[in-house]
Every structure is written in C-alpha cells, then in structure tokens.
C-alpha cells in the first residue's frame, strides 16, 4: 500500500537566509623574537642524575687563567734556557773549549729526549680526552636522522681499535649496511655487531683479574701483601682495558684515567651497588656460608670487577645502549662459583 500524502505546510514568515561565516582578519607574522621562544632540545631532554653530571663535569678539561699564566711562564723560561745554552755553545766554540762543547752536546741530547717525552705524554693525554668527545659525537649520531656521517665515524672507530678489514664482525656490519640507513641506524648496527667483539674481550679480562683478586685474598694470610697485590692488579686491569679500546697510556694519562675511574665509582657508588647486588647478597646470606677470608675475597673481587666496568665505560667510544652494560651481579656469580670450586679442591687435598 502507498503511504498517504502529507498535507501542505504554509509558513507565515519567509525563511531566513543562511548567514555566511564571518572571516577573521588576516594576521601577518613579523620576525619578532619577543613573541616566540625557541625550544632548546638539551633543556627538554631528561635530566641526568646529579652523580652523572658531576662526573661529566669532572672529566672535562678545565680552562683556568692561572693555568695559562703558568704555561706562559714555563714557556718563557724554557726559551731563555735554550737561548742561554746556544750562547754558551757559541762562546765555547769560539774559545775552542771542547769540554764545554761536550757538556753542551749532552745537554742538547737530554733536552731533546725530555721534549720528546713531553710531546708523547701530551699526545696520549689528548687521545684520552678525545675519547670523551667521541662518545658525545656518538650520542648525537644516535639521535640524528641525517645521512653521511655515521659510516665514516664508525670506520674511524674500527681503525682506532686496530680491527683488520677482514674481521668477521666488521664484515657483518658492512654487509648489513644499506644506502637508505641514516646515521642513527649505522651507528646502532656498529654497536650491535662490532663493538660487542671488543666488549667481550674486556669482560674476559675483568673476570680473570677479579677471580685472581678473590682467590688471592681468600688464601693469603698477609693483609699488606693483599693490598699491594690488589693495587698492582687493578692498575694492570685499567691498562689492559685501555689497550683493548685503542688507547695508549703514558704516565700522566694513566694517572688521569685511574683518577677518572675512581671519581666515577665514587659518584655512582651506593645506589648502583644496592640496586645490583644488595638484595641478592642478603637473600643468599653469604656471611653465614663463607669464612671471613672468603667473604673478604669476594668483596675484593667485586671491587676489581666494578673498577673494570667503570674503566670500560670511560674507554669505550660508544655510550652504553639498553642492556649492553655489564652487571656486577654477573661477575659476582662467577666469583662465587670459582671460589666454591677452589675451596672444594682444597678440602679434597686436605683429606
């Protein structure tokens, strides 16, 4: 059936016309800095801990006017000594004083050797400072989406680490690269494929030195010998880790690196130790199951391992990615297993 037709509706007033939307007046933007505030990405980044900021500030070379004045004074003194020596050699040559000439020649050789040593030490110190700058560059590249800088940077790191062109890890990294990869992806691939090869060597060195410290303290009855042994082995460990990452240490650079490691350990101290080891130690009740000397050996081994981890952090050219940083608890479990095996062997020999 068809629906009935609706009746017609008559409107008493005419329909109102739709009003057009009012257009806003145009607004011209002028180049005025007082209306806009530029965003600073460094300020918007997540703030680091106070300890990390203090460590970074301590590791940066400080420029002081007093230092410049002392350097200028030493330079003038060196120039005066050299000029006086040249004048003395000249007068000795005119007077044919061969003894004075021989002394002058010996002095020239000594000065040349000292200057060469100072230049070598300065070069090594500069290389150690440049490693911190390389980590800053790596952080920038890991946050960058540009193309063209990442590969050259990573190839320079491989050259510094003395990796051969045919190294398997380096070959895998080069085979994984594509022309569409940006700098962030290139550096991330290097950190995942090449850097772990060096980190694995450093971890093995840390495990070996920590185990030696643990066993030495556990079996040695002389505290003074223990302290000397631990100090010597820790210095050797820092030197070994620096060499693995392509850093050649001299006298002053070795002192500076060891100072940086101790500063880093001091600022990172209690919170990191509690978060990684504290609860695990309490749960296992080590003091109830080990002798006093064995517990002291575990503590010395953990100190060596922690120093090695901090040395790795300061010598690596790349910052730690998520999950890459060694944990102190991993070394603790290795030390416990090795110490347990050593004690069991000693018990069997005693029986």
Swiss-Prot record:
GO cellular component terms attached to this protein's record: plasma membrane
A family per Pfam: DUF697
Membrane topology note: Multi-pass membrane protein
Presence of keyword ATP-binding: no
Predominant cellular place of this UniProt entry's protein: membrane
Keyword terms, alphabetized: Cell inner membrane, Cell membrane, Membrane, Transmembrane, Transmembrane helix
Subcellular localization, as worded in the UniProt entry: Cell inner membrane
Classification via InterPro entries: DUF697, UPF0283
Transmembrane listed as a keyword: yes
Annotated transmembrane regions: 69-89, 99-119, 212-232, 241-258
PANTHER family reported in the protein's UniProt record: UPF0283 MEMBRANE PROTEIN YCJF (PTHR39342:SF1)
Family: Belongs to the UPF0283 family.
Name assigned to this protein: UPF0283 membrane protein ETA_16440
Lineage: Bacteria, Pseudomonadati, Pseudomonadota, Gammaproteobacteria, Enterobacterales
